[in-house]
Amino acid sequence: MNNQSLQRAAMISEHLAPTSELNMNQTSAPIKTAKEELADFVEIFPILTNEILKELPGMDMPPQTIAWVEKMINVNVSGGKMNRGLTVLHSLQLLVEGRQLSRSEIFLANVLGWCVEWLQAFFLVADDIMDQSITRRGQPCWYRQANPISNNGTIGSIAINDSFILESCIYILIKKYFRNEPYYADILDIFHETSYQTELGQLLDLTTQPNRGDFSLFTLNTYRRIVKYKTAYYSFYLPVALAMLMAGITSTPAFSTAKDILLPMGEFFQVQDDFLDCYGSPAVIGKIGRDIEENKCSWMICQAILNGTPEQINLLKKHYGLDNPTDVELVKKIYGEIGLKKIFKDYEDESYAFLISKIKSVRIMPQEVFIKLLSKIYKRDL
């Protein structure tokens, strides 16, 4: 083991349960339950947060600024389902096929998992401002929360800058834990690429409804393009691709195969999300759905246009995109008349069968990587 590897092992060992006589790169971790893996994942969050915060005094940041950053990270990064973050570890476990991961590998996979969660937080803080969303994860969106310094207003547009800080944290953590890894540049590339793809997806999402009542852009082709870039890359491809890099996979066909399955899986996930935005309970999904009020190009409106009568579509043009309860309820009533719940159920079953068929044809990497991810989202909270 070279000096750089020894230094990295020593740094990681500081954050793990005491095993001072053990070589961190050779010691296998005991097999754990899903609940224990989640607990381990959550346990390192304050460690990573501290890595960010401890740099700030040396940058001459005053106490109130440090406190702001700490609260902003705690509110926005933690508290979700953490499925994206845990997918890195779960995928790596399956990719090494038959070998038990070392404690060091588990820790590093969880660091990358938290970087994915930080990326998600960066997107959501900005997205909530652009969409004028009300709640996130069962509490007011960050920009709507009380300003912790002035105490006489909300955080408001300061949250825009906070989203930038959240993005910067990702690269601080990657540099600290992965700078000496052979795949360091690849990790940086994929995070930069995924950020750009998601930002383009957000632009597509925000510019497909320029005039209320104009449904010309509300097509499934437009919808699929939005979803591919806004959701599928960062939610599905990124965590698995990070695990592949950690596993030493460099084959271009392997990454192409992963993308070929994970991007359609991301569309499947977003269609579920659109359905839940309309019919899901805020207590279950953690937010108040606003796709109708915001005139969004959602799967629901695209299917309504495809399956509705001319009279129903004309009514939708009059009432879709208006921010008041009466219009929203009328839109939902029309959705019910068109039978969107049945259309969604059929779509879900057909998409699941399609994805299973694609997964069964995979030979270049373990099929279970994709099966495990699909099992997490099929029939979720519906």
UniProtKB/Swiss-Prot annotation:
Localisation: Cytoplasm
Cofactor entry: Mg(2+)
Cofactor note: Binds 2 Mg(2+) ions per subunit.
Pathway named in the protein's UniProt entry: Isoprenoid biosynthesis; farnesyl diphosphate biosynthesis; farnesyl diphosphate from geranyl diphosphate and isopentenyl diphosphate: step 1/1; Isoprenoid biosynthesis; geranyl diphosphate biosynthesis; geranyl diphosphate from dimethylallyl diphosphate and isopentenyl diphosphate: step 1/1
Top-level class of the enzyme under EC nomenclature: transferase
Binding site for Mg(2+) 2: D127, D131
PROSITE patterns linked to this entry: POLYPRENYL_SYNTHASE_1, POLYPRENYL_SYNTHASE_2
Domain of life: Eukaryota
Keywords annotated in UniProt: Cholesterol biosynthesis, Cholesterol metabolism, Cytoplasm, Isoprene biosynthesis, Lipid biosynthesis, Lipid metabolism, Magnesium, Metal-binding, Steroid biosynthesis, Steroid metabolism, Sterol biosynthesis, Sterol metabolism, Transferase
Residues bound to Mg(2+) 1: D127, D131
Gene Ontology biological process: cholesterol biosynthetic process; farnesyl diphosphate biosynthetic process; geranyl diphosphate biosynthetic process; response to xenobiotic stimulus
Chain positions recorded as dimethylallyl diphosphate binding sites: R136, K230, T231, Q270, K287, K296
One GO CC term on file: cytoplasm
EC nos: 2.5.1.10, 2.5.1.1
Record keyword rRNA-binding present: no
Main location: cytoplasm
GO molecular function terms attached to this record: (2E,6E)-farnesyl diphosphate synthase activity; dimethylallyltranstransferase activity; metal ion binding
Recorded family membership: Belongs to the FPP/GGPP synthase family.
PANTHER family (UniProt xref): FARNESYL PYROPHOSPHATE SYNTHASE, FARNESYL-PYROPHOSPHATE SYNTHETASE
Record's protein name: Farnesyl diphosphate synthase
